[in-house]
A protein has these predicted regions:
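Catalytic alpha-helical scaffold of carbohydrate-active enzymes acting on polysaccharides/glycoconjugates
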Residues: 1-108
């Protein structure tokens, strides 16, 4: 008897505002980049990925080629981007205008 198992793999990448560049760079070298290198080799694997706004900005400023690789995988349907508020607040704890602004900043 063959059974199919469906697994939803959702990853969350984050670095807090104000973290030192060398700390984020080390996380990039030890985690974010190696994961992407391995993931690209598994053509049948699909994931959902959330990257916080501050980390997305850091990638844009320091490793835009990483974002290009993510964009290519999104275009191929291999990565689904999970949206959120930019600075990862608890949305119910902040004013409505701030919720809207943070979501716009993240998707902007």
């Amino acid at each position: 008897m063959n059974q199919t198992i469906n697994l939803c793999l959702a990853l969350h990448n984050h670095q807090p505002v104000g973290n030192f560049d060398h700390v984020i760079q080390q996380a990039y070298e030890d985690s974010y980049l190696p994961f992407l290198d391995v993931f690209e080799g598994y053509n049948n694997l699909r994931i959902s990925l959330h990257t916080s706004g501050p980390l997305m900005e850091w990638f844009d400023n320091h490793h835009p080629e990483y974002l290009d690789r993510l964009a290519a995988l999104v275009s191929e349907g291999r990565i689904e981007i999970v949206g959120a508020a930019f600075y990862e607040p608890i949305l119910t704890m902040i004013p409505s205008r701030d919720r809207i602004g943070q979501i716009r900043d993240y998707t902007g």
